A protein has these predicted regions:
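Active-site nucleotide/adenylate-binding loops and adjacent lid/helix of ATP-dependent enzymes
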Residues: 99-180, 186, 198, 226-242
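Short beta-strand-to-loop capping motifs
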Residues: 158-159, 194, 324-328, 371-376
Length: 397
């Protein structure tokens, strides 16, 4: 029996755990202790921090695992790279993991290899002259933590008066002594899910994003297909391929963020794992195969024939998703789903139960559930999504 080590036991790792179990793989989960749903599903649990790569490597060696993987978070990616290198497992290398989890290293690689991206500067927090260093950047600019995932530690600044407060926000969301400031590219943001296997980019699936406007944009849902011209799609593929090579990503899922301006695609950043916020499900529904299964198969040493799985990229199944959120801190008093059974309502999930504490939505981890729908067309999927959301009632007091 094969063994797999899954890093994390939260909402985004649960589908990995369930899929590995379905495939008959002995499933080991490691995470810090907490109220995480993946613990009760695993064959074996280690209550260890997934960033402690020495302990995780010791576990992987002791258990003689055939693969190591995570989903929906960058936190454990460095550890995966370390373990894959040390044990010769199939997955991204430590070098690639370092680049994928440090926005400065990523931007430097893009610049070195000619990947189209925003102009940037590296800034040390203790540099009193930092405003002069970024004076040649065109406003507005983005202040970014180099080591936080999602939207945390990212602030858009429209005038020099906002520099100091933005720097404080970044400082509160980083373990590093430096950050980056980059020019804000005005355009249409979109994302893509992709997979690279043995040096080959197996697919790229562009998707649109629903964004919550807080201190910065926070993705709260996605949809596919995303309307790109043939020329723009070819350009996005070219830039993504260049970014993958620049970062030396291999044998891993890819979560990509882009922005398109004047028909040209700019790479914002890439992650060496599948996306959060129902993005793995988006891939599964669109192409008609279980994406979590393919991620696990590759991680445990198999070669997946994506060409046989993806018959026709142009005829994918339209789908859309949205997080469930609270507009205030409090305790869930009640929650109900009044939707009638419908094969096109793929999933309604509540992350918590009545009596649990939740937060007003500001960042991705504040989610309290999600809804996923599909349809004959994107309009049908989106229309059904909003109708389904209207029939879900959650009371927080």
């Amino acid at each position: 029996m094969k063994k797999i080590l899954i890093l994390g036991a939260g909402i985004y790792q649960v589908p990995l755990i369930k899929t590995a179990k379905r495939l008959g793989i002995y499933t080991i989960v490691s995470s810090i202790y907490g109220n995480y749903p993946g613990f009760e599903l695993a064959d074996k649990v280690y209550y260890e921090n997934t960033v402690d790569y020495r302990k995780i490597l010791s576990i992987a060696r002791h258990e003689q695992v055939d693969g190591i993987v995570t989903a929906g978070t960058d936190v454990a990616v460095i550890t995966i790279g370390k373990v894959c290198d040390a044990l010769g497992l199939k997955g991204l290398s430590f070098e690639a993991a370092e680049i994928a989890t440090d926005k400065l290293l990523m931007k430097m690689q893009y610049e070195k290899h000619g990947v189209r991206s925003a102009k940037f500067r590296k800034i040390f927090f203790d540099d009193p002259d930092y405003k002069n260093i970024i004076s040649d950047l065109t406003l507005p600019v983005m202040f970014k933590s180099v080591d936080s995932s999602g939207s945390r530690g990212i602030v858009k600044v429209t005038s020099p008066e906002g520099f100091d407060s933005a720097r404080r926000v970044v400082l509160e969301n980083t373990r590093s002594d430096y950050f980056i400031v980059e020019e804000f590219i005005e355009g249409e943001e979109f994302g893509a899910q992709a997979f690279v296997q043995e040096g080959k980019l197996e697919f790229i699936l562009p998707h649109g994003d629903y964004v919550f406007k807080g201190d910065t944009g926070v993705p709260v849902g996605h949809f596919a297909p995303f309307d790109l011209s043939a020329e723009s799609l070819a350009d996005a593929r070219e830039q993504l391929t260049g970014a993958v090579r620049a970062m030396n990503l291999n044998n891993c899922a890819i979560n990509a963020d882009f922005i398109i301006r004047d028909g040209k695609t700019y790479v914002l950043e890439l992650g060496g794992r599948s996306g959060a916020t129902c993005l793995a499900e988006l891939v599964s529904i669109f192409y008609g195969f279980d994406y979590y299964e393919q991620i696990i198969r590759v991680a445990t040493g198999e070669h997946v024939d994506f060409d046989s799985l993806i018959k026709d990229e142009a005829s994918g199944v339209a789908n859309a998703s949205m997080l469930l959120m609270s507009d205030k801190d409090g305790v869930i008093v009640s929650q109900e789903d009044l939707n009638e059974p419908d094969p096109d309502i793929v999933e309604v999930q509540f992350d918590y139960k009545p009596g649990d504490k939740v937060h007003a939505f500001r960042v991705g981890p504040h989610r309290i559930g999600h809804v996923i729908t599909k349809g004959e067309s994107l309009d049908e999927a989106v229309d059904l999504l909003h109708k389904a959301l209207d029939k879900i009632h959650i009371t927080v007091e």
